[in-house]
Amino acid sequence: MKPVIRRIWVDEWTVPIAQVNWRFQWLWLYAFVHPRSGQTYWWLLPYVNIQLFNKVLADFAQHFGMGERKQVILVVDQAGWHSSPKVKIPPGIHLEFLPSHSPELQPAERLWTLTNEPIANQSFESLAQVEEVLIQRCRQIMDQPDFVRGLTNFSWWSELAA
């Protein structure tokens, strides 16, 4: 529950105060985005590891009907749970690993400012409250594919698809 602190506008000579509730509890948000359509797909997880990543991949493949006739390239970073030989990649999914230390190349990275927006400068009593706010925010983002496409459909994506 590390707080997300952002700058805000205040009157001159006013000191802004943001109450925080420092705790070390974690909640992981996975985001899948199709840059051309702006469609997103989300998972909230209590932690990340290879087993959960395998479950997320399997769910993603099933939800979108991946297989022999429907293929997708999934761009991921080189986190250990993404690149382990124990990762079970479902049929129809191909992982493409980004170079190290290059989050600016990952379209999904552009979504984090949107998901952090409703929790910025807020104090929450429980992880369940944070989870509820994030679920609502993810639903709002899912309803704005044109906006998401504008953020994530980098000009060079079309060149890669050719």
How would you label these PLM feature ranges?
Residues M1-A58, F154-S155, L160:
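Extended, low-complexity cationic-aromatic segments
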Residues T14-W22, P91-R110:
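RNase H-like polynucleotidyl transferase catalytic core
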Residues A31-F32, G38, D77, Q106, ...:
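Generic structural signal for small/hydrophobic residues in well-ordered secondary structure
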Residues L52-I73:
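Short, basic/hydrophobic alpha-helical segments
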Residues E68-H82, Q106:
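Acidic/histidine-rich, metal-coordinating catalytic segments
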Residues S83, P99-S102, A128, L134:
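Carbohydrate transferase catalytic cores enriched for Leloir-type hexosyltransferases
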Residues S84-G92:
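Short, aromatic/basic amphipathic alpha-helical patches
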Residues A108-A162:
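C-terminal anion-handling pockets and recognition modules
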